[in-house]
A protein has these predicted regions:
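Anionic group-transfer/hydrolysis microenvironments
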Residues: 10, 56, 136, 173-174, ...
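Short strand-connecting beta-turns/loops that link adjacent beta-strands
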Residues: 138, 190, 249-252
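Conserved N-proximal alpha/beta basic substrate-recognition cap immediately N-terminal to
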Residues: 10-112
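ATP-dependent carboxylate activation and anion-phosphoryl transfer catalytic cores
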Residues: 222-288
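Protein kinase-like catalytic core scaffold
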Residues: 131, 186, 194, 242, ...
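Phosphate-binding site of ATP-dependent enzymes
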Residues: 148-232, 236, 247
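Active-site nucleotide/adenylate-binding loops and adjacent lid/helix of ATP-dependent enzymes
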Residues: 2-8, 70-76, 84-180, 222-226
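A short beta-strand motif that forms the metal-chelation/ATP-contact edge
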Residues: 48-53, 184-187, 252-264
Length: 288
């Protein structure tokens, strides 16, 4: 059987991981899958026919080391998503290129160094009662803050410490995240697989399971699919997998993020999605 490494990290105890649901569908198609940490320096990546980035959910702590490891793996075997796409997606400034191509997005201020006055002015700039600030290289909502005019001063010292010399982004807080939820569209080999809605727990804005978010399988509306397909077409190259996070914004849908590195694909919520992934992978590898 061909060997595929599902790239992960050393410790997943605090995370919900569903990639084991891929093992049997992949085996049915001639692939022996095993989970391997990107931090393991003893691995000979050339023994694998394919490496798929999956649950590397600590890469944001050492992004330079992560990039070096991806580059090393890419020299030894086939890496998916493609290295060029992973590097493009690792910094959220990729959203700028999507904006140029007309993808509907949440308005964003991009900062290289932290300026508290700019943060305060952003409430007026965006005509928003709340803001979200986060690093441009981040995952799992790490170092992400939901701010209001009333609590900014309380967070000032922590914000200055967190973002002093760290590229970051400021966006208006989108109330639909807490009032309705954030939707995720999952694409395997360019085809829509399934859609879920993620809602945060009470008094929170983070939709991840690890932060108490609730998840449910839903159907996509035609407009949601249109935005998803428009976003896919705006990517620099094809992807084996993609998760497009969208939210209702000003009577339409806006893209929050496009996850091409290590998105949870929530195979647990759709029992046939692991089979769809394995089948899409088979066709994708043949044509790319």
């Amino acid at each position: 059987m061909a060997r595929v490494a599902l790239l992960s990290t050393d410790n997943l105890e605090e995370f919900f991981v569903y990639d084991e649901l891929l093992v049997e569908p992949l085996a049915q198609r001639g692939w022996q899958a095993e989970t391997v940490s990107w931090r393991d320096e003893s691995v000979d990546w050339s023994v694998y026919d394919l490496v798929i980035v999956r649950s590397t959910w600590d890469y944001q702590q050492h992004p330079d080391a992560f990039v070096r490891k991806l580059t090393h793996i890419d020299k030894q075997t086939r890496l998916e998503n493609p290295l060029s796409l992973l590097l493009w997606n690792i910094d959220k400034k990729y959203l700028k290129s999507l904006a140029i191509k007309g993808v509907p997005l949440i308005p964003t201020y991009w900062g290289e160094t932290f300026d508290y006055q700019v943060l305060l002015e952003s409430f007026d700039t965006f005509c928003a009662p709340g803001l979200v600030i986060k690093p441009t290289v981040s995952a799992n909502a790490d170092d992400t803050f939901w701010l209001t005019p009333a609590n900014c001063a309380d967070h000032k010292i922590l914000l200055e410490k967190t973002f002093a010399q760290r590229p970051h982004m400021i966006q208006p807080f989108v109330s639909a995240v807490t009032e309705e939820g954030e939707y995720s569209l999952f694409y395997f080999g360019g085809e829509l697989s399934h859609v879920i809605i993620k809602t945060p727990k009470k008094h929170d804005f983070r939709v991840q399971e690890e932060h108490g978010g609730q998840l449910k399988l839903v159907d996509a509306t035609p407009r949601m699919q249109q935005v998803g397909e428009q976003t896919l077409k705006a990517l620099p190259t094809e992807s084996l997998y993609a998760r497009i996070d969208i939210v209702r914004f000003k009577d339409d849908w806006a893209v929050m993020e496009v996850e091409l590195i290590e998105p949870s694909l929530y195979f647990n919520l759709d029992g046939t999605s692991p089979q769809r992934f394995a089948e899409a992978m088979t066709h994708y590898l043949k044509r790319t």
